[in-house]
Amino acid sequence: MSIVLAYSGGLDTSVAVHWLKERYQTEVIAYCANLGQIEDLEAVSKRATAAGASEVIVEDVRDLFLHDYAIPALAAGAAYEGKYLLAAPLSRPLIAERLVSIARERGASAVAHGATGKGNDQVRFYTSVRALAPELDILAPVIDWEMTSRGSEIAYADRHGIDVGVSKTTPYSIDTNIWGTSIECGDLDLIDHAPPPDAWQITTAPVQAPDRPTTITIEFEAGIPVALDGRKLDLIDLVSELGDTAAANGIGRTEILESRIVGFKSRGIYEAPAATVLLAARTDLEALVLDRETLHHKRSIADQYAELVYYGYWFTDLRAALDAYCARLAHRVTGTVTVELYKGSARCIGRTSPKYGRYSSALADYEEADTFLHEAGAGFAYCWALPLTEGVVTR
């Protein structure tokens, strides 16, 4: 058999290439998804080859990731436990789908990942692959091998001449893509202490951000951001540029003591500058273009959608149905939002939607231009209170 391994270029998966090859006496195909991570992907490819991979596939999936995974989550307003914008969990079903596709193309009988037994990712990969290809074996070398610490993995790499580019002093576990960065482990496990300043990877500390606000405009068409400050951009460029601007202003930092899939709580800090601003802007625009009942109901699905993503239940009818629901409303989410970025805060200060906006200044005005029928309001209040009034009689 041959094995297709989800390869990141880090310690775990670099050791896994060699370990899988030796353990199963088979070829290991290393698959690395370009999701906009910071690493030098050419160096990552060379590292996989040096570790023993028979083939290395590096694939640019940034556009696919944004359009098919990040934007649907944005449309749903998904934030796990009200905070986490899910950059890493959103990438896992995409990686799993590509692993399955490559395994079928190459005739491989197994796929593998570098997740640990106590982490969320091993559940996400297992669940996604089982949903797509139950006939494939799913290998988890980090769970199966005899190495029990980061130090023992480094020692294994040294014994076998595997260059992993890390040391025992590396304090954090970091996962980065174009939608955001997650940071765990190290001193972050001391939950009664503030995160060390060096834990944050891409955002400026709000107190050190510029002393003058940065004002930007974001244009949406059918729910998708298409322009920044009046300039039409493809989605990759828009998210990248917005992310740089927001990060420089200290936007997108989140700290959460989250409830993991496997049953215990862990502390993570997350940076999602572009996603934070886009969610604020899209939510603000929805308030302008959606009627009250639709707006309130749509916001009620945000937690459920976030849980589906976090739990690894991407390939479910429920997630697809929620996407269809959001897509039905998306055409109205067309307009422009002005956002002020200042020392960690993204504040929507203006919005317009000439075609779908539901705001009427003539109705909302309390001055002479007021066109609201006040006598009708009094009658409405009487009818609105009737259920409560009648209840008093029967109680």
UniProtKB/Swiss-Prot annotation:
Compartment annotation: Cytoplasm
SUPFAM superfamilies named among the record's database cross-references: Adenine nucleotide alpha hydrolases-like, Argininosuccinate synthetase, C-terminal domain
Enzyme class: ligase
InterPro entries: Arginosuc_syn_C, Arginosuc_syn_N, Arginosuc_synth, Arginosuc_synth_CS, Arginosuc_synth_type_1_subfam, AS_cat/multimer_dom_body, Rossmann-like_a/b/a_fold
Recorded GO MF terms: argininosuccinate synthase activity; ATP binding
Pathway(s) per entry: Amino-acid biosynthesis; L-arginine biosynthesis; L-arginine from L-ornithine and carbamoyl phosphate: step 2/3
Chain sites annotated for binding L-citrulline: 84, 120, 124, 173, 182, 258, 270
Keywords associated with the record: Amino-acid biosynthesis, Arginine biosynthesis, ATP-binding, Cytoplasm, Ligase, Nucleotide-binding
Binding site for L-aspartate: 116, 120-121
A cellular component term, taken from the record's GO annotations: cytoplasm
Chief location bin: cytoplasm
Gene3D superfamilies from the UniProt entry: Argininosuccinate synthetase, chain A, domain 2, HUPs
Reaction equations catalysed: L-citrulline + L-aspartate + ATP = 2-(N(omega)-L-arginino)succinate + AMP + diphosphate + H(+)
EC code(s) of this entry: 6.3.4.5
Gene Ontology biological-process annotations: argininosuccinate metabolic process; L-arginine biosynthetic process; urea cycle
CDD domains named among the record's database cross-references: ASS (cd01999)
Disulphide bond pairs: none
List of residues binding ATP: 6-14, 33, 114
HAMAP family, sorted: Arg_succ_synth_type1
Subunit structure: Homotetramer.
Family affiliation: Belongs to the argininosuccinate synthase family. Type 1 subfamily.
Name by which UniProt lists this protein: Argininosuccinate synthase
Organism of origin: Rhodococcoides fascians
Lineage: Bacteria, Bacillati, Actinomycetota, Actinomycetes, Mycobacteriales
